[in-house]
Amino acid sequence: MARTGYSATIEGENVARAKANELPVSPKHSIEIARFIKNMTTTEAKAYLTDVVALKKAIPFKRFNRNVAHKRGLSKWPAGRYPVKAAEAYIRLLESVEKNAEYIGLDVENLRIDHAAANTGRGLRAFFPRAMGRATPKRRETVNIEIVVTEVA
């Protein structure tokens, strides 16, 4: 696996960051969650994503919303979904960035998400064996997720 950096260069004493590479999660769901949690605090984002996993609140889908039904509880955008697997990955990454912030001496209660991004990772290729000696290719999608938080006074 190649070494990859962060897509945003946010430097400073009150900055913590975390990254997860090649997670077996949908890139489209990850991009929508990253757009939604940007500029939230980490506690707000974790609480909302926990409700998404419990199917109580939906994530609004603004970009990848073809044939997406309206969901109850979305105020400004009607189309949405419950991306449970991607939300669980983001919860783990938010816990990681909070631990990183605590390690460098930041206050965990005052962390704001300044940068959240999801990029497609490496596609893992395999084949479905078929009848008559044929084979159909399959490709498993992966995603790289990164979060950068800053301490707000």
UniProtKB/Swiss-Prot annotation:
Keywords: Ribonucleoprotein, Ribosomal protein, RNA-binding, rRNA-binding. GO terms for cellular component: cytosolic large ribosomal subunit. This protein binds specifically to 23S rRNA. It makes multiple contacts with different domains of the 23S rRNA in the assembled 50S subunit and ribosome. The globular domain of the protein is located near the polypeptide exit tunnel on the outside of the subunit, while an extended beta-hairpin is found that lines the wall of the exit tunnel in the center of the 70S ribosome. Gene3D superfamilies: Ribosomal protein L22/L17. GO terms for molecular function: rRNA binding; structural constituent of ribosome. PROSITE patterns: RIBOSOMAL_L22 (PS00464). Belongs to the universal ribosomal protein uL22 family. Part of the 50S ribosomal subunit. InterPro entries: Ribosomal_uL22, Ribosomal_uL22_CS, Ribosomal_uL22_euk/arc, Ribosomal_uL22_sf. The gene is rpl22. GO terms for biological process: cytoplasmic translation. The keyword ATP-binding does not apply. PANTHER family: 60S RIBOSOMAL PROTEIN L17 (PTHR11593:SF10). The keyword Ribosomal protein applies. This is Large ribosomal subunit protein uL22.
